[in-house]
Amino acid sequence: MESLKILIPTDFSVQAEFAYLMVKKLEERTPVDVHFLHVLNVPDTVTMDSKGEIQTCGEIDVKYVVQQKDIAERKLENLKLLYGQNIHTHFLLGKVTDAILNFAEKNHYDLIVMGTKGSWGIREKLSGSETQMIARKSRIPVLSLMCDRSDLNIQNILLVHDFTHPAKEDLQLIQKLVKVYNTKFHLLQITSGKVEAEKFRVEENMKKFAALNNLENYACHIINDKDVENGVIHFNQMNNMDIICIGTHGKGGIFHNSATEKLINHLFKPIISFHLN
């Protein structure tokens, strides 16, 4: 079976450890190729050449940057001692979000996994806002989680979507999880109108979506709520999903980015955000 190439951005916090524990959970069913990346947040005027030498225009002390680089590289080496020599570690300079996104796309990762402290994150850590920005901009699926889910038993995966215009989406990662865990796939649409009035139309669209995306073991759900975030939270309270998947495109409408970002910050469930076509 082909391995999943996974990137874990790390600030060496316990949240980054949660991300690794989640990846180890995935490894129980599918091979994984794990890469840790630490980005030292510095202006674009600070650069590092292929030999690791630091250059700067002068507004930042080179010695300070070198010192921080040495500390980070020691911590990355400690990750290998802790998790094994089969993991890969990387160090970059730059703006955290842009560096992570560029590195992930350049190296063709299948998944980015990030631990987050939600909206209460400490500024220097990979806070909820950092994870939000990466989920918003990334064309690679992002799995985010707020706590240790190493005990997770993956049986039910929820896909929250607007099924008004059924289309083929890039669900390769989600379909792989469904296959290796033999899970049930739940399709959910949240409406602000009357459920009974829309139920037949929505379920027909869900069936078309399932056919277009080769989904088999699935169930259809439609609920009424004031917005996507509350709808997902209330549905999960009633049905206890194990992983929640939600698409992003930033074009407005019911599935604009804010719904995903609010869920990343407030829902104590692993969330996979993926880019809609």
Predicted regions and their residues:
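Glycine-rich, Arg-bearing micro-motifs that act as flexible, cationic patches
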Residues: 115-133, 246-267, 276-277
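Solvent-exposed polar/charged
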Residues: 25-28, 81, 105-106, 136, ...
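Hydrophobic alpha-helical segments and helix pairs
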Residues: 96-146
